[in-house]
Amino acid sequence: MKVDGGLGPDLSHDLGTFAAQAAEQEAAGYNGIWTAETNHDPFFPLLLAAGTTSDVDLGTGIAVAFSRSPMTLAATANDLQAFTGGRFILGLGSQIKPHIEKRFSMPW
């Protein structure tokens, strides 16, 4: 059985702790580490995690697709895939119309 962990989506988590959290989760035997788009960008914590891990999969679960340019999103995913040695998994979601229009100021 595979068990995955995550890097703190709640407001009390400090970005400075994410690298250590990732290393602890890998040492504990987790198979993957996931982030979500909440109060932090979902990609940056994975970059931090990549620097302190070597085997776990690293993924977004989820990143909001409609608030980003497809080319920018593809470039970010490609860079993370290269930097992690193929361990990055891109999870995308659509979000709901009010969040896209109000939170991200993007057209629906």
How does the language model describe each region?
Residues 1-60, 66:
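N-terminal beta1-alpha1-beta2 module of alpha/beta enzyme domains
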Residues 2-12, 16, 70-108:
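Flexible, glycine-rich active-site loops centered on histidine and acidic residues
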